[in-house]
């Protein structure tokens, strides 16, 4: 469990969730699990705009969860997370789970340590591929650790793809 904490936070610039059955605008962050966000709207994670980011509260306690929900079930087999100033504010260890009901969760990506190269406006991404999950209504990303140089983490976009469709 480690993070580049030079600025006392980590950041994920954005998380875009999309596939053939659910547009990014249909991926809403579950409010009950994102109480630590500073951003006006966690929807910045799924708006398709890499120039804006959702940001955690300063001095956030880790681990913390980010939960996305869809109004209708979706299928996907890949997640991409995009961050800028990643060495200063990106997650450095994450895992992902899915659920059909928001109660029972299945791990699809175990805790994974992430390496970031840049501390500037370079938009970096991390890709997580796995066996296709179907009939999913909830995606939970657990941020175990992060670069917290600026006392928070930020995500520009979180994207979910169904490459098998």
Q: Locations of the language-model features?
A:
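Solvent-exposed strand-to-loop "edge" motifs in beta-rich extracellular domains
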Residues: 80-87, 144-146
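Short, conserved beta-strand segments of beta-strand-rich sandwich/propeller modules, principally
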Residues: 78, 138-140
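Short beta-strand-plus-loop segments that form exposed binding edges in beta-rich domains
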Residues: 1-6, 142-149
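Tryptophan-centered short beta-strand motifs
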Residues: 105-108
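Short beta-strand elements bearing conserved aromatic residues within extracellular beta-rich modules
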Residues: 94-96
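Short, surface-exposed tryptophan/glycine-enriched loops
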Residues: 123-138
